[in-house]
UniProtKB/Swiss-Prot annotation:
Alphabetical list of Pfam families matching this protein: ThiG (PF05690)
Record pathway: Cofactor biosynthesis; thiamine diphosphate biosynthesis
Subcellular location: Cytoplasm
Family to which the UniProt record says this protein belongs: Belongs to the ThiG family.
Protein name, UniProt field: Thiazole synthase
Positions bound to 1-deoxy-D-xylulose 5-phosphate: G161, A187, G188, N209, T210
Location (main, coarse): cytoplasm
Subunit field text: Homotetramer. Forms heterodimers with either ThiH or ThiS.
Any single biological process term in GO: thiamine diphosphate biosynthetic process
EC number(s) stated in the UniProt entry for this protein: 2.8.1.10
GO molecular-function term, one example from the UniProt record: thiazole synthase activity
Function (record text): Catalyzes the rearrangement of 1-deoxy-D-xylulose 5-phosphate (DXP) to produce the thiazole phosphate moiety of thiamine. Sulfur is provided by the thiocarboxylate moiety of the carrier protein ThiS. In vitro, sulfur can be provided by H(2)S.
Encoding gene, per UniProt annotation: thiG
Length: 260
């Protein structure tokens, strides 16, 4: 299968994972290993990656030499906060430009604030960041983010942490069909079938955290998500049969029947 390419770098895995909500860093690493993910996103405002030398450092468990670290701006509600957070992340990661931008609008549902997201994206791209951006599943705004220069656009499947799966597949198809950068579903995936559906629609990848971390067995769920993403991608490439309503088509041959 073709590899996922983001900002000129190719990845074998199309599953991207988060690092929050696990019981400890050991479980985090075990789940990531089971998922096969190569890109791992980290909430800079909530996770220590060197800001506090007195606390355990996530990068000791998930070294940048093995994984692509994707700092994100979870918890930011303005463009200015998001930009400041990613400037700090770039310093902590020795100039690493790849980042995940998210600017939230409502703390009760974590839906993105799109005007602030667009504003932050413009600033970050001008400053040389390679921006992967969490956004609403609005085809027009997704195209605007692409045209600003974002290296990947990441529309939500449903609300962050909801586990509701793909609630608007038609918008996702519109976004995918019009895109010239990778489209990665971000947020709302609850189980492996959700991940498979996203990939069958033609998404280039899926990012998740809660679906794995809050499973009864996170390690097993991480493995299931890996398989779901792979199966969905293969099904997309294979091309599903056409739906035929009220038009029977026997799966067994109809010619050369015995006695005919």
């Amino acid at each position: 299968m073709h590899q996922l390419t983001i900002a000129g770098k190719a990845y074998r895995s199309r599953l991207l994972v988060g690092t929050g909500k696990y019981k400890d860093f050991a479980e985090t690493r075990a789940a990531i290993d089971a998922s096969g993910a190569e890109i791992v996103t980290v909430a800079i405002r909530r996770t220590n990656i060197g800001q506090d030398a007195s606390q355990p450092n996530l990068l000791d468990a998930i070294p940048p030499s093995k994984f692509t670290i994707l700092p994100n701006t979870a918890g930011c509600y303005t463009a200015d906060d998001a930009v400041r957070t990613l400037r700090l992340a770039r310093e902590l990661l020795d100039g690493h430009p790849l980042c995940k931008l998210e600017v939230l609008g409502d703390p009760t549902n974590l839906f993105p604030n799109m005007p602030e997201t667009l504003k932050a994206a413009e600033t970050l791209v001008k400053e040389g960041f390679q921006v992967m951006v969490y956004c609403a599943d609005d085809p027009i705004q997704c195209k605007m983010l692409e045209e600003i220069g974002c290296v990947a656009v990441m529309p939500l499947a449903s609300l962050i942490g909801s586990g509701m799966g793909i609630v608007n597949p038609w918008n996702l198809r519109l976004i995918i069909d019009n895109a010239k950068v990778p489209i990665i579903v971000d947020a709302g995936v609850g189980t492996a079938s959700d991940a498979a559906i996203a990939m069958e629609l033609g998404c280039d990848g899926v990012l998740m955290n809660t679906a794995i971390a809050h499973a009864k067995d996170p390690i097993l769920m991480a493995s299931a998500m890996k398989k779901g993403v792979e199966a969905g991608r293969e099904a997309f490439l294979a091309g599903r049969m056409a739906r035929k309503y009220y038009s029977a088509d026997p799966s067994s041959p109809t010619s050369g029947l015995i006695g005919s």
